Amino acid sequence: MIPVDMAAEIGTAINMGRKITGPTRVVAPPKDFPSGEVLGDKIEKWAVGITIAPRKEQTYNITVDSFLDAGWDSIHLFCEPKVIVADKHSYLPITRRKKKHGAWANWLASLKDLIDIYPDADCYGLIQDDVIFCKGLREFMEQTLWPSGDTGICSVFVPSHYTRNNPGWHKTNRGFKLWMAQTFFFTPESARSCANYEFCKNWNKQKQIDNVVGRWANETKQYPYYFSPSLAQHIGDTSTIWSEGNRAAGKRAASDFVGE
C-alpha cells in the first residue's frame, strides 16, 4: 500500500506545479529530480488489459486479483491458446487468440484491440501476467498522471537498477535498451502512435517488448516515466520466452516495492 507520508510528499511536489491541458514546452528535470506537475484532465475512463500465456506455474490469477484489489473494477484478458481462465474471472472481458501469437505479437495485437474496443479511454494500459500491485494504486495514478508534456508511457513497476532516491515520476529514456514492460500505461495519443509505428509493426521477433517500445518512445519523443519507489513487483518464476530460471530477481525485480 502507498505509505501516507510518501503520498503526502509526492502530492506536495505535484501541487507546486501548474496543471496544463494544452501543449507545453518541457525542460528536462535534473537526473534524480522527479516531475512536479500533473498535465491534462483527471483520468476517468481506463482501458487496461493483461496478456496471458500458458506457464508451468500460472501466476495470472494472482496478478488479476492484485490489480482489482488496487482499485480497478475490470481488466481485459488477452489469452494465448491453452490458457485456462479461472471461474472467478469468467465475468471479465476476454479475447482468446485462435493461434499462438507469441509475446510481442500478442502484446501489440492487444494494444490495438484495446484502442478499437475502448476508443474513448483516457488511459490505455497493458500489464503482464506476473505482477502484483500496491493497494490504492488507481486513485494514486488518477492524481498523478500525466507527469510531463513529453510523457508517452508510465510504468509503476521499476526494475532495481532504475530506482531513484527521490519519490515521484522520473523520465527514463533508454531507447532500445529500455528494461521491463510489466506495467506500461499510455496516453491515448501515445497508444495510437505506438500501435501504428512502422518499427513496431515490422518487428518479427517474439521477445523484447520493452526494447521495441523503448525505441518507439525515443524516436517519437514520447518518453517513458518510471515511478520510484516501485508500486508493483515482478513475481514470475518461470518465463514463456526466456530460457533462464527466475526472471523476477536481480535487475528484473524491484528493490523498493512498497508492498501490497
Locations of regions flagged by a protein language model:
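Extreme N-terminal basic, low-complexity initiation segments
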Residues: 4-6
